[in-house]
């Protein structure tokens, strides 16, 4: 202490030398506030940016500093706790170990941040084993929270004894606050944030990047609701909406169970429910007579999952027992309090605000990382420039170094601080003005680096460094480029770690459903051969005149091609018929909405498809908007020419695993499906340009498992390409499109009705120019066409832009394709107001040879 500093205590008496009078109420108030803020900011609440409390952040950083990564061996938990406590968190070891254990529990964390080995507790409330017995390391996804932390991406502060530094926040490559949630009790406030699905949260974050003005309702198109690690069900969408809209709410969580005749089997419990205590409470209620109708209760849970069996008494009503269990045990309430630290202050956040805080943090991280890398690259470019200059005058540089008295003298000479008058041959040597860093590197160069090969490598590296500098400057100077980097990195995390939802959202009377929050709009849905699927707004595609090239509609992975395109409303139910003869159902809005350049999402994440099973036909149930007394049928055709008709009533209860729609022969597959009313004419078109028209009454209605009857006689090398149903009130023409992009309209009357199983008539010429037929549709004057190529181009064009000609003709160019591309799919849709006038596109004139031989 300085000698002139005032003495606070009398050295003889120990009494304070100065006494300050204060009101005890004010002092207690201020001291309490200081204590409260210390607890709030330093212990109980997570940071909105990385979703971590200080203890969790310090544990992960201590593991990072000790090299305990996802690829290293597990380390004793006691060692991790000791390093955390000694270097960063001077609190009790039990508190640190409890925090470590929670990050390893897959029933507490949606995406565990610690990979534990040993007993870290259970859903029965068992405590973790002592820290000397368990081992741990970081999980792979935890490493993403610390990625690039060495690149000045976040602020560091001194640790508790000023001996080390620790991060104030982690870079956090994914929105951990929402993904893993958080809970804690501070002074006068608490937080309780539920976990969410990683893929949904990232999709919402990306949506916010592109639509900063979006609403909570818009974001809920991506984030359905909390996604608990223990699964179970959330009852009602309204409570979720309120919690996301205000930051506070109460969500009802219901166990998953199967009600059978003589038992109820519980397989999933509400989040944070102690299973052992639950079973005990049920037994107590049965003994007390609160719950009646139960004769036995068994916990058959094992490492494969939860299974609690409630055996019912003979004659007991399973629904009554179920309702009693729901009232007392199987349904709980999760109180959402989305409270987190924003700029060090506690704040209740809406869903949008939570994502915004994270997004701003990631922008800062990417900006700081880019600046850090830019500085490094500039330093490296400076060194390389010096080395290249030295190599250009290598003889003079070598002479200067050789004639210098020592290394420092040589460096000084290279910096131009003095002149080496002459070398051993008596010649004057030039002067240089290298910087200090350049001179140091030049003097340190080995003789082997003077070779021409080494010079080429330096030039290549210099060019590469300059390119990277330009890219980094673009990122730093262009907010859109910076956001693109943030989006790409988020998408990478999603593709690497996202999995399916575990918690289902079930509806309740009087609630706002998830569907209510989704705007009704027409969309374009694309499916690929590898069963990638996505939807895009119809407004993304402007109408062009025929002969245009269209615009990109999807990106494709290597080896994949487009299989089908169709237009639907977001609220439509779609039935997906597959190559195995199965049918599945899905709401259009459940298909992920993506950009035109995105690849899509694997359909196996939406439909439980078998290996090798492909979507071959899609039926929109909006086409079945009929009176109750009207019958409708699904009329199906296979590539070998079999046709069948089955009542739509047979498809009312479609399971998530699908149901059979048609039995198929060997090497046969379902090609097309149409909705008919029992009185329609059917047109079958083949790949080689034949077509047959007959009444659907020629095909009797059969069950789902039937194979059907022959619809057309095919040549040995021919196959059915499409099925069209004639609507006399709306359809005027038959539209035929070939794989090389040619097509035509022909009056329906030119296709005379025949008997089923005939050879048919020539519909279109399938020569080298046209290629094979890929689609046959019945169309009206108000329709427009959506054509998609195998490589992902989409053309939207009016049907009346296509010439009306006879049957046995060549047709005109409809879509201009690359030489290696072909038409994959065609769909028709009633023309909308925004498509009434087509763009000129790249359309060709009508002077092509639209007619050829006279129809036979």
From Swiss-Prot:
Functional summary from the UniProt entry: A type II topoisomerase that negatively supercoils closed circular double-stranded (ds) DNA in an ATP-dependent manner to modulate DNA topology and maintain chromosomes in an underwound state. Negative supercoiling favors strand separation, and DNA replication, transcription, recombination and repair, all of which involve strand separation. Also able to catalyze the interconversion of other topological isomers of dsDNA rings, including catenanes and knotted rings. Type II topoisomerases break and join 2 DNA strands simultaneously in an ATP-dependent manner.
Keyword Aminoacyl-tRNA synthetase carried by entry: no
HAMAP family per the UniProt record, alphabetical: GyrA
PROSITE patterns per the UniProt record, alphabetical: TOPO_IIA
Any single Gene Ontology cellular-component annotation: chromosome
Domain Topo IIA-type catalytic stretches: 45-517
Subunit structure: Heterotetramer, composed of two GyrA and two GyrB chains. In the heterotetramer, GyrA contains the active site tyrosine that forms a transient covalent intermediate with DNA, while GyrB binds cofactors and catalyzes ATP hydrolysis.
Pfam families: DNA_gyraseA_C (PF03989), DNA_topoisoIV (PF00521)
Family stated for the protein in its record: Belongs to the type II topoisomerase GyrA/ParC subunit family.
Compartment list: Cytoplasm
Region of interest (Disordered), ranges: 822-856
Protein name: DNA gyrase subunit A
EC number: 5.6.2.2
Motif GyrA-box positions after renumbering to this chain: 544-550
Known catalytic reactions: ATP-dependent breakage, passage and rejoining of double-stranded DNA
Gene Ontology biological process: DNA topological change; DNA-templated DNA replication
